[in-house]
Amino acid sequence: MTALVTFGETMLRLSPPRGERLETARELEVQAGGAESNVAVAAARLGRDAAWFSKLPDSPLGRRIVSELRSHSVDTDGVVWTDDADARQGVYYLEHGASPRPTNVVYDRADAAVTTLETGEFDLDAVRDAEVCFTSGITPALSETLSETTADVLDEAQNAGTTTAFDLNYRTKLWSPDEAAEVYRDLLDSVDLLFAAERDAATVLGRDGDAESVARGLADDYDIETVVVTRGEEGSLAVSDGAVSEQGVYETETYDAIGTGDAFVGGFLAKHLDGGSVTESLEWASATASFKRTVEGDIAVVTPEDVERVVAEEGDGISR
């Protein structure tokens, strides 16, 4: 049995050297990055068995994705390969900013192979047999086919007794708040553990008020066992079976903020799968996220010792 299975798109990230613009760059650094695979990598590096599945073109670009994930001990045996010449590998370009010039992201993900992935193409037993199955709101946004597949995966997992985890992860460049809300509300009925940025809950689901009221409202309305609300510099809050846990942020010198939220989820799930309480899982989530911000790339190159050191030096979890 695999502890964690994640499902979604992973893209290739192409970045010019810091201080250079995309339009003048002569070199681009290549890395892999995607919400669900970032979560799998973080959990795997923190000692949990983790797998990621998706659909990739059988090309050097698709194989580049798998090679990088495997280097971090993520199981990719469930990946569906296609030799369809029209199936592309999604790419995004990241130009690092420096005040007053903002960081700029340009996506080139249309017609990615994953957008055609149907439920019958992969082995659902991997989902049914996992302890936790995770995906995010990015996945159903990519295509109607993938939206249906996401619903099937969450339903099958929950019906089999697998804990289903979902991060709203709303992206304005993919769909409107109304489009996202319609899909999210259907999916949330099959979610046991929800991660939601405070701004996403407000923008997409119309949930205003303080973090605790937002978390309790979502938990009650959708019968979700645990709801974790992230609040940026104000930390995070979780409501689980009626009990509230809070966690502050850890001070960090930010080098690359991309992937911070995924590292948070990966850290939480790693501790959760190790039998940790919600308060302990929030500590690990916050510590993993802070450590990620010191590392280049989407992926949290972190160890359990790294997280334990951050928690030991600055732990400030609260449970009430």
Curated annotation (Swiss-Prot):
GO terms for molecular function: 2-dehydro-3-deoxygalactonokinase activity; 2-dehydro-3-deoxygluconokinase activity; ATP binding. Induction: Constitutively expressed. Pathway: Carbohydrate acid metabolism; 2-dehydro-3-deoxy-D-gluconate degradation; D-glyceraldehyde 3-phosphate and pyruvate from 2-dehydro-3-deoxy-D-gluconate: step 1/2. The active site is at D262. Transmembrane segments: none annotated. Keywords: ATP-binding, Carbohydrate metabolism, Kinase, Nucleotide-binding, Transferase. Its EC number is 2.7.1.178. Disruption phenotype: Deletion of the gene abolishes growth on glucose, but does not affect growth on galactose. Double deletion mutant kdgK1/kdgK2 loses the ability to grow on galactose. InterPro entries: KDG_KDGal_kin_Halo, PfkB_Carbo_kinase, PfkB_dom, Ribo/fructo_kinase, Ribokinase-like. It catalyses: 2-dehydro-3-deoxy-D-gluconate + ATP = 2-dehydro-3-deoxy-6-phospho-D-gluconate + ADP + H(+); 2-dehydro-3-deoxy-D-galactonate + ATP = 2-dehydro-3-deoxy-6-phospho-D-galactonate + ADP + H(+). It is an enzyme of class 2 (transferase). Substrate binds at G34, A35, E36, S37, N38, Y92, Y107, D108, R109, R171, D262, D298. ATP binds at N169, Y170, R171, T230, R231, G232, E233, E234, G235, G259, T260, G261, D262. Pfam families: PfkB. It comes from the Archaea. Gene3D superfamilies: 3.40.1190.20. Homohexamer. Involved in the degradation of glucose via the semi-phosphorylative Entner-Doudoroff pathway. Catalyzes the phosphorylation of 2-keto-3-deoxygluconate (KDG) to produce 2-keto-3-deoxy-6-phosphogluconate (KDPG). Also catalyzes efficiently the phosphorylation of 2-keto-3-deoxygalactonate (KDGal) to 2-keto-3-deoxy-6-phosphogalactonate (KDPGal). PANTHER family: CARBOHYDRATE KINASE PFKB DOMAIN-CONTAINING PROTEIN, HEXOKINASE FAMILY MEMBER. Belongs to the carbohydrate kinase PfkB family. This is 2-dehydro-3-deoxygluconokinase/2-dehydro-3-deoxygalactonokinase. It comes from Haloferax volcanii (strain ATCC 29605 / DSM 3757 / JCM 8879 / NBRC 14742 / NCIMB 2012 / VKM B-1768 / DS2) (Halobacterium volcanii). The gene is kdgK1.
